[in-house]
Amino acid sequence: MASIDGLPPLREVIRAHGLSAKKQLGQNFLLDLNLTAKIARLAGDLTNSDVLEVGPGPGGLTRGLLAEGARRVLAIEKDARCLPALAEVAAAWPGRLEVLNADALEVDLAARLTPPIRIVANLPYNVGTELLTRWLSSDWPPFWESLTLMFQKEVAERIVAKPGSKAYGRLALLSQWRTDPKIVLTLPPEAFTPPPSIHSAVVHFTRLEAPRHPADPKVLARVTAMAFNQRRKMLRSSLKGLVPDIETVLREAGIEPTQRAEEIPLEGFCALARRLAG
């Protein structure tokens, strides 16, 4: 990568700027520029897209995105210590990188980007799930074309899980309702500095133009939250606060009241959401 952008290896960048990953910010720096380039390629053709990156750290993935031809990258970094390193990346790619020192949970990201937009990020562990849930719960179709996101491997497995498995839950439902998510890369702890205690995985989400089954997003979100907060309880118990006669509503949706949340496929929860909304 250094031969492409003229910048030093990431270990040198980290040493030069005195950077160390902060656990409280959910940081783990990915230093292998071959891997960051691979993740950028897994996001698809970037040449005509704006790319949103959250948590760029010292800029390893940022460099990969720019080298792979991203039209423009907007990098949101909460940690001000990383800004000088990112400024060096911006100088190497004039006019193509904008760095915003902000919390991604508090910024209107769509307003700063020009479609088509792809989101590619090694998400900070402490906000990754919340950001994903927001991006999946927005108006549809959303402002983004695709998501290519790194998570803890356990979270990635929850995203692609099927009914009846231990990993199956609300995150799988929300992800698979409106996108086609696939695990496209698994990374060992030693790929990062500092090495986390777990493996990581990259998930690529291809958005669907319409949800797989019709349902009101707010109703579906509420139903799945209640059902999976008490996932081992029968649905007639976990959902009893929704309506006076929940057993009748469940049966009308094709669900037995004695079933548990982990047994119900996406289609069943969408049918239940429609009955409750109607």
Curated annotation (Swiss-Prot):
Task: Spell out the reaction equation it catalyses.
Answer: adenosine(1518)/adenosine(1519) in 16S rRNA + 4 S-adenosyl-L-methionine = N(6)-dimethyladenosine(1518)/N(6)-dimethyladenosine(1519) in 16S rRNA + 4 S-adenosyl-L-homocysteine + 4 H(+)
- Which positions in this protein are listed as binding S-adenosyl-L-methionine? N28, L30, G55, E77, D103, N122
Q: Where in the cell is it found?
A: Cytoplasm
Q: Give the highest taxon in the source lineage.
A: Bacteria
EC? 2.1.1.182
A molecular function annotated in GO for this UniProt entry is: 16S rRNA (adenine(1518)-N(6)/adenine(1519)-N(6))-dimethyltransferase activity
Entry-linked InterPro entries:
KsgA/Erm, rRNA_Ade_diMease-like_C, rRNA_Ade_Mease_Trfase_CS, rRNA_Ade_methylase_Trfase_N, rRNA_adenine_dimethylase, SAM-dependent_MTases_sf
Q: Where is the signal peptide?
A: none
Keyword field? Cytoplasm, Methyltransferase, RNA-binding, rRNA processing, S-adenosyl-L-methionine, Transferase
**One GO CC term on file:** cytosol
Q: Which NCBIfam families match?
A: ksgA
State the protein's purpose: Specifically dimethylates two adjacent adenosines (A1518 and A1519) in the loop of a conserved hairpin near the 3'-end of 16S rRNA in the 30S particle. May play a critical role in biogenesis of 30S subunits.
**Family the UniProt entry places it in:** Belongs to the class I-like SAM-binding methyltransferase superfamily. rRNA adenine N(6)-methyltransferase family. RsmA subfamily.
Q: What is this protein called?
A: Ribosomal RNA small subunit methyltransferase A
